[in-house]
Amino acid sequence: GLGDVYKRQQVKYLVEQGKLDGEEARREDYAGKVADSCYRYVLDVLERTRPVVKALSERYKLVLVSNFYGNIQTILKDFGLFDFFAGIIESSVVGVRKPDPAIYRLGVEAMGLPAENVLVVGDSFSKDVVPAKTVGCKVAWLKGEGWGNEEIDETLPDVIITDLPELLSYV
């Protein structure tokens, strides 16, 4: 777009003036392209999943349990998801991280329900499925490509889905 043309002109000018090294400019350009690509991916995912989260929030109390850095509320607001959650349990705020089952106990407490009446939806077998089951929750495993060579027992989750919209036919 026009913004990209303007940015390229700025970079070219800075290189010509000796204020920016050509290699540094290429790295910066590449980093910007990677960031833009990641951002577009997030927007694509949100387009598919926001309606699901909205529908679930209209029928159920939703609490987010996440290993994050103290700014997840801002991120959720920026992407129009904040209002769907009745509570947020963020690891850096509560001082406990997944896979410690204690973070799921905090989520269950925030729900105000017995653990067996809580459905945890998670994408990590070792950090979501195992600790949530340890606490006594039901679990929907959003199974994607694995992060490593963790041992997996596919009988442990109550349901296995590969795309979030599938969850609507389960609940």
What are these regions (language model features)?
Residues 1-6:
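Short, small-residue-biased leader/transition segments that mark boundaries at the very start
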Residues 7-10, 68:
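Hydrophobic/aromatic residues within well-ordered alpha-helical segments
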Residues 11-33:
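Conserved alpha/beta-hydrolase catalytic His-Asp/Glu region
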Residues 13, 33, 37, 55, ...:
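Solvent-exposed, charged/polar functional surfaces in cytosolic regulatory/catalytic domains
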Residues 17, 37, 91-92:
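Alpha-helix C-capping/helix-to-loop hinge sites
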Residues 25, 50, 54, 63-171:
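Asp-based, Mg2+/Mn2+-dependent phosphohydrolase catalytic module
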Residues 35-63:
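Short, acidic loop-to-helix structural element flanking the phosphoryl-transfer center
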